[in-house]
Amino acid sequence: MEFNRSITLRALALITAFFISHTALGTPLIKPFLGHYTGSTVVEESGVELNRDLDVTISETDEGFNVFWKSTTVKADGRIKTKDFDISFTPTDREHVFQAAQRPSLFGGTKPLDPMKGEPYVWARIVGDTLTIFALLILDDGGYELQIYNRSLSDSGLNLEYSRIRDGEQLRTIKSTLTKD
């Protein structure tokens, strides 16, 4: 009985140490990116050039980091279209790779969404001065769409390069410089 209790306590200590060190892996990599950034770009929709305002906030969480981003476009007819995303990321066993923590898991943690249900599979990586977020969608016909957000550190804030690819075809590219507030 005492032997089993000792093993249980050691296992709990080992699991706790793993989660503490596992969580700490990602924290230093995100520090240079932390902050609030704003900017704008011009996008073309149906042959019309439209201004798009961009807003990004990168913050630390207890488990990793969070990225909130919003784009606001004034359409030619005056309507305002806003899209926003708010995704937390946690470290993985790979030093520079982070999984999205978008849905509660069975054991109280969080997990990515399910791409087989039409939900985006999202992950991030940090390589050098670039934070990249990937969003993979599996389409109804079995094809795919991949959205890539490269956010590279610059003297004034972040350089954003966005790409949207469907079944190997480049559908959209957006570039902008975002200023850190």
Predicted regions and their residues:
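Bacterial N-terminal signal peptides that target proteins for export
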Residues: 2-12
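Acidic/polar low-complexity flexible segments
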Residues: 160, 173-181
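Central antiparallel beta-sheet cores of small beta-barrel/beta-sandwich binding domains
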Residues: 40-139, 144-146, 169, 179-181
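Short, exposed beta-strand-loop hairpins at the edges of beta-sheets
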Residues: 150-153, 161-170
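N-terminal helix-cap/turn-to-beta initiation motif at the start of protein domains
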Residues: 24-38, 60
